Amino acid sequence: MAILNELYPSVPYNVLAYTPPSFLPDAGTQATPADLTAYEQLLKNLEKGINAGTYSKAIADVLKGIFIDDTINYQTYVNIGLSLITLAVPEIGIFTPFIGLFFAALNKHDAPPPPNAKDIFEAMKPAIQEMIDRTLTADEQTFLNGEISGLQNLAARYQSTMDDIQSHGGFNKVDSGLIKKFTDEVLSLNSFYTDRLPVFITDNTADRTLLGLPYYAILASMHLMLLRDIITKGPTWDSKINFTPDAIDSFKTDIKNNIKLYSKTIYDVFQKGLASYGTPSDLESFAKKQKYIEIMTTHCLDFARLFPTFDPDLYPTGSGDISLQKTRRILSPFIPIRTADGLTLNNTSIDTSNWPNYENGNGAFPNPKERILKQFKLYPSWRAAQYGGLLQPYLWAIEVQDSVETRLYGQLPAVDPQAGPNYVSIDSSNPIIQINMDTWKTPPQGASGWNTNLMRGSVSGLSFLQRDGTRLSAGMGGGFADTIYSLPATHYLSYLYGTPYQTSDNYSGHVGALVGVSTPQEATLPNIIGQPDEQGNVSTMGFPFEKASYGGTVVKEWLNGANAMKLSPGQSIGIPITNVTSGEYQIRCRYASNDNTNVFFNVDTGGANPIFQQINFASTVDNNTGVQGANGVYVVKSIATTDNSFTVKIPAKTINVHLTNQGSSDVFLDRIEFVPILESNTVTIFNNSYTTGSANLIPAIAPLWSTSSDKALTGSMSITGRTTPNSDDALLRFFKTNYDTQTIPIPGSGKDFTNTLEIQDIVSIDIFVGSGLHGSDGSIKLDFTNNNSGSGGSPKSFTEQNDLENITTQVNALFTSNTQDALATDVSDHDIEEVVLKVDALSDEVFGKEKKTLRKFVNQAKRLSKARNLLVGGNFDNLDAWYRGRNVVNVSNHELLKSDHVLLPPPGLSPSYIFQKVEESKLKRNTRYTVSGFIAHATDLEIVVSRYGQEIKKVVQVPYGEAFPLTSSGPVCCIPHSTSNGTLGNPHFFSYSIDVGALDVDTNPGIEFGLRIVNPTGMARVSNLEIREDRPLAANEIRQVQRVARNWRTEYEKERAEVTSLIQPVINRINGLYDNGNWNGSIRSDISYQNIDAIVLPTLPKLRHWFMSDRFSEQGDIMAKFQGALNRAYAQLEQNTLLHNGHFTKDAANWTVEGDAHQVVLEDGKRVLRLPDWSSSVSQTIEIENFDPDKEYQLVFHGQGEGTVTLEHGEETKYIETHTHHFANFTTSQRQGLTFESNKVTVTISSEDGEFLVDNIALVEAPLPTDDQNSEGNTASSTNSDTSMNNNQ
């Protein structure tokens, strides 16, 4: 049995915090597949899985999110997943893992796919039908299913053969027969795409072409993925027959041609379909056209924009993925408020004259960075209408306030008994992702019945769902939803238009419909580069010029995922870029131009201009590999530096890129790209007479080249060379310890060769040349690229006696005595690390013995520092000891730091922080503690230390620290600055004090310590974090801390009493649902939906952690446990009942509907099925497993009104049981002792007279009778109840 102290324990507890705080569910889990962070996390898991060979598990998690949790949109995830195309992956390539993503049935995971899992093509059909505004015909279904079935069979054979090869150890471990089998499968797949892709868009009917285009876009993506694998992995698969250098060149031509062809085809078909809609004359046709644009954008154009990234020549394999941000906006959703023909858009005129940035559909819609939504002000009315004498509420007007202006949609009446205005405040950090509408269906006070003939429907309530799952109500009556308008996945509402209702009666001029503007969530993020992932990989980033801070003119562009910026002659444009990691980048521009145009290009790093010169942007009209868009042919151009290099050194800060058109023609700018350049170490090997070993044995000869790094290597190694004339073919073999990691063919007879070795977490590698023959003279040039190799250059080496003396003095100063058993009180952990750097720089040859002794001493100092530090992992050797934001990573190899450090990147869509709590049991009473750390670089970093209420809260700016030349006596880092007392201080080091009075083990306030970024472009690199004992408190300090603690304890007890009073009754009621009060056990046999629904969860004041906004507080954790217990009870009820969707929360799914039966939401939030009159009914046929004619069943029904439930069974339904339900209020009625004559039973619910409202119905096995119970007889009973399972679930 759950008790209060288990759910709300006295230890640990803090009025401000709770440990351990778990992550809040991603926003999508609470409402719609909306939150981009959920997709990003699943993508990280897939990336790790591909490299570790566990991708099937990662894909299984994705499929669960799609088909079970309903938190992920299939199409959106696949589109985002294509960003992995540039990853360095094993020899299986990228196509093999994606087979299981495209076809759920082919995902080779231990757990089978969800029973309702479909392939991506089947999952697209509802959107396609919505786009063409009809159901797919049987012929269309047969055509589409047949083509995809053929592809699935080929993909399954490809996958099976690849699995077979990998099970034997890879391609260099299998015989030629298996390799031929696999290459045959590769070529068959390639032929299928080439032959069958055109059939999806070549048809005489416009609908067939349009409905086939989403299929075409996915299949084109798959084909380009396969071609890229052939180009990058083919030489490893089969270098002698099918994937020779000449064949690879041919495939490179194919991929370039197909990118251009597939892009043009999608664009042309889209444009043809768009033209067919013409100029809409009313809101209905306008909405259909916009729905066409929405589906075509998300299902076709968003895929086509990625096609150029599949070209390995243009986007080669690198250390990370590629991220090309989208900024294009979509008009969605359309929300009818009051229209001419019920709550539809039929025959309602459209007026866009008051829409900013619309420009008759050719505009970009309001820029979400310039027009930031602030508030909606709604003006509802309660006014007698001419329909049945009933009051009909509706919306006169809505006032939309953004950061630029306030604009009114609709018309305010001169005189009207208004029930408003109602305000909805909008938080840009927690945007709206769904709009819910409650239509007016209930009678006003005093009315005798329901208005069943409400032909001119109206809205009684609007509510807005935010990204974190919280709801904003417009306060217009109902506030719940019978109609849900979800935005496209990973989008948010950036603006809201309104169109007036135009009629000749008194309602003319007020709002007829609302139209949303949906914007990708990444569109307003800062332009961030250089952000490493957990493996240290840095992505290639592309930012639309539409995100520029000034200049240019926005022009419509459909194919790029963003509108283009037209740069006319003399015009300039600037875009800010924030770099997280100092390093080298290649800068590229994607543009279109109809003529050769000179553009002045300026990269301003705030102290240097590595690019500051005129660049020729050549005409792209005749470019053979460019992609045609609305404004020209788009190509990618690398930008040269002033010294004609293509590598730019960019510091860790915010820089600005400026372009000025100095020519005479327009240039259309799509995006700017930053490609990280990994540190390169080139080794050239000359071996004039080497002997090659056997191709199947480990060579006994010395390797040509070996790594010497003690760090795991990740990245790629480019191999280029030329063999001498008349030489034989050979193999370049790569060994990790005693097995091959990869082989690369070397052609004989003086041919050039080039290839790439992908490296994943390899500590050492040896390179040999081996074959069954003897090699000839030749040279091999190895280009080794390793992103973890650290900075170059030779380390400093101290050889002078005075250097030894200086360093020895500093080592001794770390301790209080010569025994080295205690650290000096003013020594920080970072001080120790500076001394370590100097000790390590002592010459081994000159001071080998002394260096060994000093290293022993500094190691002891480090151990003492770690022992006194109350934080765990202060040097981030144990990152798991910290609570941290999703994108916070551990990084090594900083010139100022011996140990690892943590990088807090810009927040993006999730907060960036680290947090740890020191428990009360580790502290001493009446003691001052020092909190300190080292900051290598920080922008907008907040430091918070809290015991009784955030005693320390500082935001700091620390300039980027560059290491001084290492000397034996001087500091390692940085120019000191003056402090308030006239002394010099180090801006990179912080130190604060916090006082602890009497210990309070019951409430466990402890010391809480956190660092977080408080600005979108902020970042920080920190290390050497400590909380250590300083000194006992003086008498006056004890009195001060006692007073603070007393006040804190008073507030704590007050809040605890309030929360206890709210949660104790809920605990008691949930205990009553379960046998023996065991929340993880079985529910009691007499529990019904009403018992669960009667439990109303309280509203607790602090659901989020006080510091970590993406994690639960203690109160939030309690609410999650409550909801989990209710969900488990509900799931058991669902499992026990024989009927599906008997609670009607999924509308009438699983039921056959006759008449106008549909789900409605009542004023009190009940979701019920409404049968408006005697002509309406719903029915469901069930089959009882393990049927026993003697088994008894119980019917439980909860509803309001007059109706019947019939149960038909027996052969040809000879037996009919009828259960009547006549109650004016919501009441539970039961029918017990039911037996059936067959395993098939048809249950029908129908109205007898007027409106019949059904809350839920269940048909369950009757519990076994006890000694004092008799189950014989067919009896009925009823219980009056005003509760409902469906209260806003």
Curated annotation (Swiss-Prot):
It comes from Bacillus thuringiensis subsp. darmstadiensis. Toxic segment of the protein is located in the N-terminus. Signal peptide: none annotated. Endotoxin with nematicidal activity. One of its GO terms (biological process) is sporulation resulting in formation of a cellular spore. It comes from the Bacteria. InterPro entries: Cry_V (IPR041587), Galactose-bd-like_sf (IPR008979), Pest_crys_dom-III (IPR005638), Pest_crys_dom_I (IPR005639), Pest_crys_N_sf (IPR036716). Residues 1263-1289 are annotated as: Disordered. CDD domains: delta_endotoxin_C. Keywords: Sporulation, Toxin, Virulence. One of its GO terms (molecular function) is toxin activity. Residues 1274-1289 have a biased composition (Low complexity). Belongs to the delta endotoxin family. Pfam families: Cry1Ac_D5, Endotoxin_C, Endotoxin_N. This is Pesticidal crystal protein Cry5Ab.
